[in-house]
Every structure is written in structure tokens, then in C-alpha cells.
């Protein structure tokens, strides 16, 4: 090592090399030493050739020989002696020689010495490095782990129009692959290829596999010709498989099968894993015909069938609502001697619960004959718990939950998520503490501490989480997901972020579920306003978003009507090799449909199909609703027929949407046809369908028929849930609030609908008092029955309070509020807004103000608007103006009705300048006052000789495309023209 450095030092010294011919007398003495150190006759002849070429003035040829000798040197000392020999013989080294020396030093494990040589002898002597030197420095800098500098040198070579060597190009591409920067690596490959160079085969293979593994399908296909040209034979089987799995990952099942067949033609064996993977893709695309064809092909070829194959097919059928076919595959599985496992039962139990057949799902759970004990599987329990809850069996759901915990099963964050849906709000941290105690007890084997005092519950939850983290990092990640969900449901994202940071410091890797909860909360709190702020937060959190993250982001962006940003998310996913899900497209289509942008919704639906993403039932239903909502009945009907054809047997969800949709569109006959098909398929109308129909007929004023349907639910053993009660009560309260009784809109065909819904029992009797549905006594009677029938949640409590208020029973409303709070249910903004509105209608504005100021909640637009309108009704314009300013400081603008009410109040009070400012505020928000209020204000301004302001308002009216009211227009124009000066 010291000898090598000493020899290299000779080149670092600043010395001028002569270019004149040296005397022949000097040659023997110099050459003798060199020849004595030479390794053989070949090297001696090369050195002699260098001298001869130098003497003849053929310096470029001499330097080429020098470069080749350096490249062929077996040690640093040999390379250094050759270079020294050349300089001593008057041949100055050029860039190619310097490049060869740098490369040789690096190859021999001296990249640091090579860099020093480059800095002193090349840069230090003012030599502009050419492509040869830069190419060698790429090699050197990669070895020094200074990749950015190496990449910059390679870019300089390419920019100068030269071709980098395969070595340097392959090193840079390899390092990019090490950093998972496969798209950059492919771009580098393309640039090098364009310059006439390339990569080594090993590097091409690595890049190809990386592109395939990360879903960059187009780029991987772009490399195929290069790989085939390099191998000059069929692709190796591992590259075939990489491309095959890439096709599957991107949802290109047809292309994957074509490659699949090509492999078999080339004589490669296609294994069971590849068959199963392709089958899974066909199932994802709802193409069960092709999936079954693959299954039969596997049977023909005598593959050993395993649970994964059957689970894939069962899940495919169950997902489409084809439960009978799924059950047939389950029977085939048992018949062929393949043992079902926990995933088999998880799929089947989840599917039957989703379809509402929870009793059969429970029988499967209890009587399972699989190879694994599913009675200890948390996912099966969670599906059953949620299934019973959805069906209205709250007691059964709670019993199952307690049995699960008592049996020592460790709950997870999904269990907690279901728990939040089941139990009253505002106790999220208490529920989280129960789950954490179970994780500590059942998962970590540690008896949790008994917590009697629930004060400062956040500290206790954090203590439990810390105990779990010290015992098991994986369970700690689950516990963290539970806690972040609890905190985010309370909008406490700061505490959630703090918990994540602390757990990371304890060595816990948070689940994506934790980050996704925080991302959603940040959107809801308007912390994330655009994509730039989203990117910053993701970078700060240092996590890789998954598909669920992108779905949350798209949903929140669509709620803000920022569809351009939502489409940008899809583009970003595709660039990263991620395939946007059908749920992401459905969210955008639904948002467009609500805005009446049907053409754009159609284009998005078409784009989804072009991307190879097959719509599921929900996507079809969203598109059908978009057509129906916007009066495109023919298109809706065509799509309905396509759904029925495509899904063979639609699910209960699909039938529910179709039947209720046709009834709402007034197409009762069509609704009855699909109800018949639903019954023929063995599916029963569920609580969702009944509730939708009840809501529709209530809006039409047909209370008798609505109550008939409500009673029929009980006769058909369909338990009324919270939403059914809320729908019924809300319809009654709307009727009571109307000044004039609404005429019942008779819809032909409803009796046919009723007859189909009646099964075996006689029609339920209708209460005699139903005709007096608008009376206060009837309202109290209904509320009493509801309170006896179901344990209300917060939303039903609010509906009941609305009923008391509508009946003028404020005292009873407050009594109900008090009992609700004793049950541990915390009132929300809606509760207080209902009471405020009732006080205002009762003529008690002061109590409404006290309620507004006494609430601990941050007011929203509805609460502000309710009080603002009340102040205007009580002719308190200055208080109303002050409230509007408070709203605007909070970042909330009044809605159009509130602005109109305030404008009327200000005009009535002759506060014209304040009214002018309100109109200008409205115009800035693209809200235009009604012509009557606008005209009234202009008239008052003219009367007060404030013609400048009157003309300004007149200009705003013209800008909005409206005109003054005809009754006052001539007089107003005359007054405006009396003074021409603005």
C-alpha cells in the first residue's frame, strides 16, 4: 500500500513534461529500469513501441498504447511506472491516459487516491476533463458512495453527446435501483441507449425486475427488445415471471394470460402460484367465467388444489353477491379433500353478514369443520358483531363482543372501529381504554391495572399503550391505531400526532391505519387545504401512503369540490405504479353527479374502463343515480340492464338502490319488476329499502302509506333501526312545521308495491289517529312509542328533541336533554341549534343568545345563521352585523338566506351604508341579492340622495344580469338620472 502511494505521488508533483525527442543515450538507462520491472516480453515490446511512436511524432498512437498498457496492468505500481516511463520519454499524457489511471486506481481499491490524482493532475493543471476522464470519475465516485456527484458526471457525458461506458452506466443505474428510483433508472437507461451505449446484462435484468415489481408496466415492456437482443434467445423464466406479475399487479389480466401462454410455448413450466395469481385478477375484475376456466384447466393438468385456489374463487363469487355459487365452490372444496382454513370462513361469514343473513353466518362460525380453529379469530368475530348490529340485533352484537373478550381473543383496530359505530358518541377514549386493556391482558399476558377513576383518561390510555409497547411492538402498533382513531374522532389531531411520535421513539412502526386517521382528521379541520400542504405533511410524518390513504384524500377533495386535485391524485398514483381503485373513481363520479356535471361523470366512468378497472356494483349504482338525479332516465335504464346482465344475480344492495330509485323517479311499475326479481333470487327486502321508501312517501305527504310500510317492517320481522326511526320522525316534524297542510300526492301503482312486500301475515292495522298526524298530541304519542322501542343514539335524541320543540314542549325538550346527558351522551352543535331555533320561534331571543354563548362547541355556519336570522327577526340589526363580523373572522361566511335576511333588516332600519357593504360582500362571493331587496335598497339610497352608492349597486345588478323590478323601475331611473355626477 505504501509503495503504491509513493509511486502515485510522483504523478501528483507538478512537473512539466517535454515534448521534444530525447537523445538515444538517455533511453537505455531509463528503459532498463523499466524493463527490469516489466512483467514479460509483451509489456517490453509495448514500451518499446511507445518510444518508437513518440520518436516518429505519432503521439496520439503512442498515447493509445499507453492507455492500453495501463488498462492491462495487474497492479497500481505497474500502471504508475508505465505512465512515468511515458512522461520521461517526452510523451505528455492525455485525457484518455488520465482516465485509464483513475479507473485503474479505483479498480485496485484506491478511489480516494484516484480522486486526489484527478483534482491535482487534471483539474489542478487546468485540463478540461473529457468523456473518458468523466467516465472513470463516475466509477470512482460511486465507489466513494458519492452518488449524486457520480450522477452529475454521467449527465455531463450524455449532455456533451458522448456515449458513457457500460461500466459507468450500469453502476449509476444499479445505485438508482438500490434506492428504488426505478423510473429515474429507466430514464437513464433510455439516455444511454440513445447515445449508442447500454448496460450490462445483469443490470438490465435488475432494472427490468424492479420496474415489474413496482408496477411500471410500460417502461418494463420498453426494455423487452433490448433484453431479447442481448440474450438472443427466449427470456429467462425469472424475467417472464417478473413481467407476468407486473401485468397482474396493474390489472392487465388478458395480457398476463397471453404472456402465460407464450411461456408455455417456449417450453417453460407455469406453476400453480402463477395460475392462482391470474385467477385472482380475473376475480378482481368480476370475470368469474375466465376464473373458472383457469380452475378447470388446473384440474385437467392434475395440479394439487389448495385452500388458496378455492378461497380465491369463493371470494370472487361472494363479492358479486352470488352466494349460492360460492357455497357450491365451498362444497367442491370439501369434496376434493381440501381443508378449509380461517380465511375460507372469514370470506363466507363476512359475505353472509353483508347480505344480512347473519344467522347463517353464525351457524357457519359455530359448526366449522376446517383445519383451523376459527372460534379464536378476531376477524370472524368482528364481522358477526357488525352484522348483528346492522340488522338491529344490538344485544346480540354486544354479547358476541363480550364473549370474544372473555375468551381471551385479542381485539384489533377494526374491532374498535366497529365499536365506535355501535356505541354512543363522545366516549371514544373510554372505549379505546377497554380495547387496550384487552390487548394487554389477552395479547401480552399482563393483568391490566384496575382503573376506577376515569379522570384524565388520556394519561391512563397513554400509560396502557406504553405497557403494550414494552411487551410487543406489533400489538403496540394495533393499540396505537386504536388510540389515534379515538383522538381523531374527537378532532384532536395534535394529541394523535404526539402519540405517533412517542411510539416511533419507542421502536414501534405505526400501521397505515394510524396515519390515515390523522390525514382524514387534518382534512376535516382544514389543516390540509391543497395538494402541496398534503405532500408537506406526508413528508413530515415520514410514511408511504397506501391505496386507502389515496382514497381518503380523493374523498375529502371531492367533498371540497376540488376534482382537479382529485384527478391529480390518480395521475400521481399511476406514476408511482399504483393502480387507482374502483372506489377512488366512484368517489369522483359521485361528486360530479351531485354537481350536475353528467358529461364529466361519463368521461370519468369511461376513463375507469379504459384503465382496465371493472366497475363494481357501487360504481354502477353511483352512475345510475347520477343519470336519474339529472333527468337522464333512458341512460339510467340502459345501465340498469347492463348491471343485471353483468352481475348475473345482483346483490341486495343493488336491488335496494334500483327499487328505491325507480320509485323516487315515479316509475313504480319498473320498481315492482325489480322487487319481483329480488324475491325470485331469494333475497328479502331489508331495513334500508323500507327506510328509503318510507322517506320517499313522507316527502310526498302520504303519511298513511308511510306508516303502513313502517308497520309492515315489524310484521316481516325486520327490526327498525335508528335511521328508520329518524326518517319517520323527521317526516312528521316537517309536516308539523308547515303552515298549510300539504296535499297528498297519490302515486299509481303503490298498492302493487305493497302487495309484493306483504309476505304471509295480514296487513298491519293503521292507527286511527293517523289522519291527525300534524297534531301535537300525535307527535307526543309517536315520541313515547319510539323511546320505548329503541335505545336512541345522539342523532335520534336530536330528532326527538326536534319533535318536542315542534310541539311547543320546550320544557320536555330540556328534560330529554338532561336525561340524555345522564346517559353519557354529549349534545353536539345540532342539539343546541335545534333548541336555539325553538327559542327564537317562541319569541325568546335572549335564551337563544345565552345558549349560543354558553355552548362549548365551536359554532358552524348553521348555528351562526340560525342566530343571525333570529336577530334580524327581532329587529336587532347592529347585533346581527356584529355576529356576521364574528362569523367572518372565524372563516365562515353567511349563506344566501342569511345575507338576504340581514339585508332586509338593514333596509327596514334605514342603515343603508351597512346594507351597501353587505351587497358588496355578497357580490364578492358571487352571491346576488334577490331583485326585490336590491331594488328596495337602491330606492332608499335615491331617496337619501346617495346617488353614488345607488349607481354602484345598479352596476352590480347589471353585472349579475338582472334588472330592477318593473313596478319601480321608471321612478328609480328618473331619480338616478337627476344627477349625472358619480
Swiss-Prot record:
Query: What Pfam families does this protein's entry cite?
Result: PPR, PPR_2, PPR_3
- UniProt-listed InterPro entries: Pentatricopeptide_rpt, PPR-containing_protein, TPR-like_helical_dom_sf
Q: Which UniProt keywords apply?
A: Repeat
Identify the domain of life: Eukaryota
Q: In which ranges do the PPR repeats occur? A: 94-129, 130-164, 165-199, 200-234, 236-270, 271-305, 306-340, 341-376, 377-411, 412-446, 476-510, 511-545, 546-580, 581-615, 616-650, 651-685, 686-720, 721-755, 759-789, 793-827, 828-858, 860-894, 895-929, 930-964
What protein family is recorded? Belongs to the PPR family. P subfamily.
Return the PANTHER family for the record: MEMBRANE-ASSOCIATED SALT-INDUCIBLE PROTEIN-LIKE (PTHR47939), OS03G0201400 PROTEIN (PTHR47939:SF13)
Q: What is this protein called?
A: Pentatricopeptide repeat-containing protein At5g62370
Amino acid at each position: 500500500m505504501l509503495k503504491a502511494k509513493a509511486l502515485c505521488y510522483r504523478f501528483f508533483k507538478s512537473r512539466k513534461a517535454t515534448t521534444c525527442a530525447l537523445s538515444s543515450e538517455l533511453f537505455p538507462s531509463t528503459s532498463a529500469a523499466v524493463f527490469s520491472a516489466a512483467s514479460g516480453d509483451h509489456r517490453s515490446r509495448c514500451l518499446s513501441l511507445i518510444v518508437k511512436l513518440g520518436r516518429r511524432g505519432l503521439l496520439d498512437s503512442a498515447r493509445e498504447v499507453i492507455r492500453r498498457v495501463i488498462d492491462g496492468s495487474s497492479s497500481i505500481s505497474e500502471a504508475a511506472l508505465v505512465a512515468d516511463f511515458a512522461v520521461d520519454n517526452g510523451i505528455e499524457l492525455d485525457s484518455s491516459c488520465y482516465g485509464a489511471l483513475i479507473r485503474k486506481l479505483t479498480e485496485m481499491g484506491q478511489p480516494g487516491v484516484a480522486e486526489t490524482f484527478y483534482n491535482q493532475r487534471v483539474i489542478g493543471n487546468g485540463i478540461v476533463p473529457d468523456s473518458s476522464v468523466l467516465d472513470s470519475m463516475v466509477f470512482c465516485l460511486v465507489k466513494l458512495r458519492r452518488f449524486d456527484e457520480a450522477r452529475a458526471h454521467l449527465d455531463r457525458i450524455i449532455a456533451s453527446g458522448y456515449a458513457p461506458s457500460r461500466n459507468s452506466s450500469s453502476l449509476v443505474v444499479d445505485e438508482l435501483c438500490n434506492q428504488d428510483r426505478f423510473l429515474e433508472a429507466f430514464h437513464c437507461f433510455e439516455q444511454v441507449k440513445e447515445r449508442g451505449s447500454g448496460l450490462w446484462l445483469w443490470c438490465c435484468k435488475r432494472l427490468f425486475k424492479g420496474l415489474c415489481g413496482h408496477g411500471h408496466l410500460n417502461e418494463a415492456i420498453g426494455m423487452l427488445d433490448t433484453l431479447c437482443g442481448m440474450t438472443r434467445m427466449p427470456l429467462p423464466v425469472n424475467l417472464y415471471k417478473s413481467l407476468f406479475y407486473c401485468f397482474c399487479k396493474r390489472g392487465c389480466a388478458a395480457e398476463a394470460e397471453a404472456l402465460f401462454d407464450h411461456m408455455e410455448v417456449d417450453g417453460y413450466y407455469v406453476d400453480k402460484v402463477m395460475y392462482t395469481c391470474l385467477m385472482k385478477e380475473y376475480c378482481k375484475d368480476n370475470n368469474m367465467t375466465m376464473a373458472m376456466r383457469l380452475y378447470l384447466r388446473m384440474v385437467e393438468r392434475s395440479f394439487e388444489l389448495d385452500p388458496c385456489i378455492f378461497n380465491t374463487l369463493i371470494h370472487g363469487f361472494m363479492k358479486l353477491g352470488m352466494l349460492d355459487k360460492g357455497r357450491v365452490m365451498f362444497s367442491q372444496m370439501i369434496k376434493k379433500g381440501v381443508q378449509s382454513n380461517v380465511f375460507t370462513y372469514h370470506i363466507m361469514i363476512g359475505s353472509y353478514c353483508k347480505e344480512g343473513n347473519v344467522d347463517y353466518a353464525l351457524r357457519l362460525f359455530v359448526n366449522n369443520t376446517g383445519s383451523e380453529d376459527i372460534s379464536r379469530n378476531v376477524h370472524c368475530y368482528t364481522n358477526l358483531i357488525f352484522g348483528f348490529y346492522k340488522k338491529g340485533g344490538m344485544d346480540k352484537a354486544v354479547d358476541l363482543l363480550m364473549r370474544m373478550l372473555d375468551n381471551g381473543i385479542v381485539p384489533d383496530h377494526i374491532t374498535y372501529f366497529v365499536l365506535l359505530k355501535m356505541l354512543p358518541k363522545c366516549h371514544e377514549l373510554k372505549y379505546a381504554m377497554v380495547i387496550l386493556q384487552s390487548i394487554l391482558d389477552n395479547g401480552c399476558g399482563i393483568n391490566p391495572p384496575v382503573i376506577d377513576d376515569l379522570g384524565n383518561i388520556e394519561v391512563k390510555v397513554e400509560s396502557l399503550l406504553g405497557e403494550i409497547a414494552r411487551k410487543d411492538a406489533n400489538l403496540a402498533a394495533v393499540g396505537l391505531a386504536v388510540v389515534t382513531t379515538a383522538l381523531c374522532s374527537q378532532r384532536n389531531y395534535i394529541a394523535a400526532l404526539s402519540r405517533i411520535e412517542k411510539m416511533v421513539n419507542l421502536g414501534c412502526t405505526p400501521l397505515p391505519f394510524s396515519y390515515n386517521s390523522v390525514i382524514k382528521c387534518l382534512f376535516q379541520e382544514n389543516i390540509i387545504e391543497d395538494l402541496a400542504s398534503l405532500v408537506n405533511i406526508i413528508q413530515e410524518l415520514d410514511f408511504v401512503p397506501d391505496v386507502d390513504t389515496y382514497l381518503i384524500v380523493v374523498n375529502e377533495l371531492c367533498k371540497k369540490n376540488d376534482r382537479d386535485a382529485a384527478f391529480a391524485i390518480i395521475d400521481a398514483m399511476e406514476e408511482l405504479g399504483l393502480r387507482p381503485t374502483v372506489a377512488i373513481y366512484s368517489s369522483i363520479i359521485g361528486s360530479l353527479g351531485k354537481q350536475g356535471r353528467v358529461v364529466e361523470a361519463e368521461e370519468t366512468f369511461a376513463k375507469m374502463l379504459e384503465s382496465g378497472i371493472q366497475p363494481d356494483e357501487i360504481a354502477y349504482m353511483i352512475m345510475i343515480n347520477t343519470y336519474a338525479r339529472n333527468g337522464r332516465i333512458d341512460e339510467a335504464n340502459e345501465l340498469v340492464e347492463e348491471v343485471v346482465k353483468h352481475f348475473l344475480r345482483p346483490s341486495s344492495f343493488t336491488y335496494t338502490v334500483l327499487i328505491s330509485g325507480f320509485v323516487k323517479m315515479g316509475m313504480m311499475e319498473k320498481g315492482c319488476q325489480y322487487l319481483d326479481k329480488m324475491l325470485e333470487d331469494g333475497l328479502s327486502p331489508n331495513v334500508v329499502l323500507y327506510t328509503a321508501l318510507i322517506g320517499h312517501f313522507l316527502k310526498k305527504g302520504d303519511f298513511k302509506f308511510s306508516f303502513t310500510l313502517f308497520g309492515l317492517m315489524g310484521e316481516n320481522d325486520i327490526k327498525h333501526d335508528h335511521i328508520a326511526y329518524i326518517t319517520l320522525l323527521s317526516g312528521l316534524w316537517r309536516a308539523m312545521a308547515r303552515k298549510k297542510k300539504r296535499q297528498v300526492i297519490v302515486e299509481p301503482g303503490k298498492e302493487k308495491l305493497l302487495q309484493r312486500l306483504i309476505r304471509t301475515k295480514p296487513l298491519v292495522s293503521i292507527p286511527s289517529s293517523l289522519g291527525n298526524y300534524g297534531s301535537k298530541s300525535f307527535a307526543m304519542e309517536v315520541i313515547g312509542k319510539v323511546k320505548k322501542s329503541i335505545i336512541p343514539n345522539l342523532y335520534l335524541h336530536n330528532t326527538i328533541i326536534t319533535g318536542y320543540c315542534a310541539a311547543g314542549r320546550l320544557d320536555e325538550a330540556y328534560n330529554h336533554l338532561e336525561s340524555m346527558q345522564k346517559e353519557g351522551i354529549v349534545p353536539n352543535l345540532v342539539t343546541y341549534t335545534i333548541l336555539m331555533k325553538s327559542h327564537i320561534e317562541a319569541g325568546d331571543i335572549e335564551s337563544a343568545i345565552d345558549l349560543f354563548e354558553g355552548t362549548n362547541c365551536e359554532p358552524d355556519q348553521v348555528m351562526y345563521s340560525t342566530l343571525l336570522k333570529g336577530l334580524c327577526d327581532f329587529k336587532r340589526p347592529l347585533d346581527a352585523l356584529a355576529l356576521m363580523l364574528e362569523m367572518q373572522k372565524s372563516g365562515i361566511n353567511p349563506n344566501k338566506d342569511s345575507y338576504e335576511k340581514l339585508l332586509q333588516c338593514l333596509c327596514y332600519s334605514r342603515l343603508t351604508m351597512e346594507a351597501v357593504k353587505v351587497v358588496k360582500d355578497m357580490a364578492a362571493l358571487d352571491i346576488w341579492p334577490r331583485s326585490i331587496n336590491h331594488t328596495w335598497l337602491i330606492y332608499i339610497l335615491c331617496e337619501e340622495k346617495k346617488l353614488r352608492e345607488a349607481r354602484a349597486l345598479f352596476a352590480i345588478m347589471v353585472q349579475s344580469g338582472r334588472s330592477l323590478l318593473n313596478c319601480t323601475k321608471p321612478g328609480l331611473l328618473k331619480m338616478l338620472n337627476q344627477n349625472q355626477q358619480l
